[in-house]
Amino acid sequence: MNGMASDRIAVMQATPGDLVAVLALDDRPDRATEVSEAVVSGRCSVARVDDEIVGFGVRGTFFGHDFLELLVVAEHRRRQGVGAALVEAFVSGAGPAKVFTSTNASNAPMRALCERLGFVEAGTIDHLDEANPEVVYVRLVPAAPGALP
């Protein structure tokens, strides 16, 4: 099915039973151990459309703040709201103040998604991938109404 997925996306915590489908989405087999550990430890969320896992995100921390370490969306579901749903679910479950993510400077789709969802550039990290700096993004999360400072 090639229709728009945005109204049928369900985001939930990944379970060990999701692991095969999650790993099949990632085109980088060198990350299999890291992704497997994220699933088992409860740091991975999956996006489902019509009961098919079509994306996942891995949560971590960055200098004590919530950090979206990895976002992967099935190629046939890109630009249909799956990535945005995963990011928004991450932000809504994150701690107060701010959340971070990063991507290579060459990853124009992810950079556009970050900017569309209210993230701003916080800086760059050189020399992780030669000639392709890592761009770090931050999104300030407003405090819940009635929350104490």
What spans do the regions from the language model cover?
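Conserved N-terminal entry element of GNAT/NAT acetyltransferase domains
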Residues: 1-17, 139-149
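Acetyl-CoA-dependent GNAT
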Residues: 9, 13-70, 74-76, 87-88, ...
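Short beta-strand element of the conserved SAM-dependent methyltransferase core
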Residues: 45-48, 135-140
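Conserved acetyl-CoA-binding loop-helix of GNAT-fold acetyltransferases
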Residues: 73, 79-92, 112-116
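Conserved GNAT acetyl-CoA-binding A-motif
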Residues: 93-105
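Conserved catalytic-core motifs of GNAT/GCN5-like acyltransferases
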Residues: 100-102, 120-136
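Conserved N-terminal glycine/acidic-rich loop preference
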Residues: 108-126
